[in-house]
A protein has these predicted regions:
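Short, T/G/N/S-enriched strand-turn elements that build extracellular solenoid repeat scaffolds
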Residues: 546-560, 576-586, 627, 727-732
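Short, conserved beta-turn/loop elements at beta-strand boundaries and strand-helix junctions
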Residues: 174-183, 249-255, 259-263, 509-516
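Glycine-centric low-complexity/flexibility signal
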Residues: 571-576, 595-724, 734-740
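Polar/acidic, low-complexity leader/linker segments enriched in S/T/G and N/D
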Residues: 1-94
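The right-handed parallel beta-helix/beta-solenoid scaffold, focusing on the short coil/turn
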Residues: 149, 217, 235, 243, ...
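C-terminal extracytoplasmic interaction modules
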Residues: 1, 56, 68-75, 83, ...
Length: 740
């Protein structure tokens, strides 16, 4: 039976009221600072300057009899007060905006509670907490708001340790009580970028201490001390939303080194007018800009959620362009993110399982990406929906913003424009579909970036992408992930001859149900356009097996020549199965960066008249290549031996387990119990564990399958075959032998 546990983290003070402990001293005095002791929350704190919070985790589940829970083997308290849990999956919008947030809505039954776990001073209270109030009403009263608190949804099977359950990470967006119910709505962390929560730049608190004329060369800020508190040593400020000035600063005095800067005019200003700091990005990679906007201007964003190295690799080496902007007034972070997603060509989403913000460039799906067809798609669930509103035949981009204080969508506020037209698209559809973009991010001298933007949008949306909706069986090997590219095949997808074709697509919404995965995807056909060439970088950002690097290269680039530099990058979360470097001309400089995993295939378990299969090799090469392993390289695990008590080897009471790898090995059949299939990280268990006829376990990555009395497991696979050809930039985590 599937079990769902909800966890909330409440900021809970480590100190004890009026006491000195190893955690520190609370200076509160009962009867002076408060009439009763606190509840160790900020709202009830009598000495806020000393508030020292750590997360207190509260856990909840649906009523389920005598079910007990553990975390890392230790019993934990889980309150059985959940009435319902509903999940609305996220929707990503490739190359357009950040899409819609994933939402978890939990309805709780409010109930009396003893205040155990949430009150350090139960013995000092002059009332019985169980007889006074209810749990959630008291929780709400003791905290200023639950909004922004960490929220986790754990899903597993009954009896699973909480640490082994799949955990989805969110933040609370709202909480409310009505009658005997209490409702919490949590969303993915991009809700923190909402316009009501995050602005960049932040509003400045400095104002003019005295008026200035249009020719004055300095100004003084008020209140005293605000200069050191909020303003850097140099930069730009916008005065009263009318004039931008460059400055250097000493204390509260700004020396105005350029009046009427950034396309504005010098003007006189009155005492008390706001002096707003301008946020400036000059020739920065989009990955750097987005990281800064999120980490420094979006309260609650944890820098650990951002893999800056992977982001930089993605945009610097695939997009290869820099961007600039002056943001002269507080602007919604979500607005800035949406502009960059569209104008750079990005896909951006929250990975709720890995707790990572994912950033990818808008690019074609590999011809070797996972194929979903009739064997994986549940019958009658496939639908293809036309989306004519997404078609583009012309892109007009205005760039080189004149004045950051003027309207963003005013044509006269831009120095340059470029229009890119696909005349065949206009002819095919007998009408134009014009897309206008007003970019603060593309400087007037950066025409190549504007040209690339136009070509990229035409490439992606020249033909309106269809929406594909379908359900996949829960038992499939290639589990889909949000944002991943794949290929889909259905009788309704045909070419002009009526032949069924496999169309490329990208997962835009993923809902996990008990027996299926419900997928929404967007067709990802790219029509070749000019201005899209970059350095030769090949990304592997979806799971693939049988990866030949030369084949992948030749699918997107022309024939390689000697002395070319070519990089392959396995993205975080992606698996490259059975990597073969392939044949290349002499002196090509090859590098593969593994941020995800490179795995050999798992061996199948021993069966009747069938030997167990050895694990496969993860990386094979006979050509020089450099490897920067930031993830995992692992040979496949060997299949386990079957289990039987008969020297005649019949019957086979228990099947052996499949080896770890990609794809994982299959378990074998047994009369009493089958062996389990392997996974990408662990070998499957043999059947009938703990009996005399138990099947052998499949091997972990690079490990042999387990032998039994009469059954024989197979050898583990090699991590690398061709080690002498490799220049190891970083060895990283390796499972299995390195040979030759």
């Amino acid at each position: 039976m599937t079990v769902t546990v909800i966890e909330l983290d409440i900021p809970f003070c480590d100190l004890r009221y009026g006491e000195t402990t190893t955690e520190g001293t609370c200076p509160a005095v009962l009867g002076v600072d408060s009439e009763r002791k606190c509840f160790n929350t900020i709202r009830t704190c009598a000495a806020r300057a000393s508030f020292t919070p750590s997360p207190l985790t509260l856990r909840f589940c649906m009523p389920a009899g005598d079910v007990e829970f553990t975390r890392n083997g230790q019993p934990v308290v889980v309150i059985p007060s959940i009435k319902s849990v509903n999940v609305t999956p996220a929707i990503i919008n490739p190359g357009v905006d950040i899409g819609n947030r994933e939402t978890v809505r939990v309805v709780f039954e409010d109930h009396p509670h003893s205040d155990a776990m949430v009150d350090k001073y139960l013995a000092d209270r002059d009332y019985d907490p169980y007889q006074r109030g209810t749990f959630f009403a008291k929780l709400r009263a003791r905290n200023p708001s639950l909004e922004g608190y960490a929220f986790r949804m754990l899903v597993g099977d009954e009896g699973d340790d909480l640490a082994d359950m799949t955990t989805y990470h969110y933040v609370i967006d709202s909480a409310s009580g009505q009658g005997e119910q209490f409702t919490i709505a949590a969303k993915d962390v991009l809700i923190l970028a909402d316009k009501k929560k995050a602005q960049a730049p932040r509003i400045s608190n400095g104002v003019l201490a005295a008026g200035i004329s249009e020719v004055d060369g300095s100004l003084t800020l008020s209140p005293a001390g605000i200069g050191n508190a909020e303003y850097p040593a140099s930069g730009k400020v916008a005065i009263a939303g009318k004039e931008i000035c460059s400055f250097t600063r000493s204390g509260d005095v700004l020396t105005l080194t350029q009046r009427g800067d950034s396309g504005t005019e010098a003007d006189e200003h009155d005492e008390g007018e706001i002096v707003q700091l301008v946020l400036i990005y000059e020739s920065e990679a989009p990955s750097t800009i987005i990281n800064d906007i999120l980490v420094n201007y979006t309260p609650g964003v944890d820098p650990a959620w951002i893999n800056t190295a992977e982001w930089a690799t993605e945009v610097d080496e695939y997009i290869g362009r820099l961007y600039s902007a002056e943001i002269a007034e507080p602007t919604s972070v979500i607005e800035l993110l949406n502009e960059l997603i569209e104008q750079v060509g990005l896909v951006f989403w929250w990975d709720s399982i890995t707790k990572q913000l994912r950033l990818r460039s808008l690019r074609p799906v590999s011809a070797e990406a996972t194929l979903y067809g009739d064997d994986q798609i549940m019958a009658t669930t496939f639908r293809a929906t036309e989306q004519p509103g997404k078609r583009i035949s012309e892109v007009w981009t205005y760039y080189g913003q004149r004045n950051p204080l003027e309207g963003l969508d005013e044509v006269k506020n831009y120095r340059a424009a470029i229009a890119t037209v696909d005349p065949e698209a206009d002819q095919d559809y007998e009408q134009s579909a014009i897309k206008k973009i007003f970019s603060r991010w593309i400087a007037s001298n950066n025409r190549p970036a504007a040209s690339r933007l136009n070509s990229m949008l035409l490439s992606r949306y020249r033909d309106a992408p269809r929406k594909f909706s379908f359900s996949l069986y829960e038992t499939i090997d290639a589990v889909p992930t949000l944002g991943a590219g794949f290929r889909v095949e259905s009788w309704s997808l045909q070419d002009d001859t009526g032949a069924v074709v496999a169309e490329p697509a990208q997962v835009t919404s993923l809902e996990r149900k008990e027996d299926r995965y419900v997928i929404d995807a967007q067709e990802a056909i790219f029509v070749t356009q000019e201005d899209l060439e970059t350095s030769k970088v090949v990304f592997i950002d979806e799971n693939m097996s049988g990866v030949n690097l030369r084949t992948l290269h030749d699918q997107i680039y022309s024939t390689p020549e000697s002395y070319e530099v070519i990089r392959f990058i396995v993205s975080s979360g992606a698996i490259a199965g059975t990597v073969v470097v392939g044949d290349w001309p002499d002196f090509v400089d090859l590098t593969i960066v593994i941020n995800g995993q490179a795995l050999g295939r798992g061996g199948n378990a021993q069966g009747l008249l069938v030997n167990a299969q050895a694990g496969g090799t993860a990386i094979y090469t006979r050509y020089p290549i450099s490897i920067d392993n930031q993830g995992t390289i692992g040979g496949g695990g060997g299949g386990g031996g079957f289990g039987t008590t008969s020297s005649e080897l019949f019957p086979i009471e228990a099947g052996g387990g499949g080896g770890a790898g990609y794809p994982p090995g299959s378990g074998s059949s047994g009369v009493i119990e089958n062996g389990q299939n392997g996974t990408t990280t662990a070998g499957g268990l043999g059947g009938a564990q703990g009996t005399a006829y138990a099947g052998g376990n499949g091997g972990g990555l690079g490990q042999a399958g387990q032998n039994t009395t009469y059954g024989t497991g197979a050898a583990g696979g090699r991590a690398v075959d061709g080690d002498s050809y490799i220049n190891w930039i970083n060895l990283g985590t390796v499972h299995g032998a390195r040979v030759n």
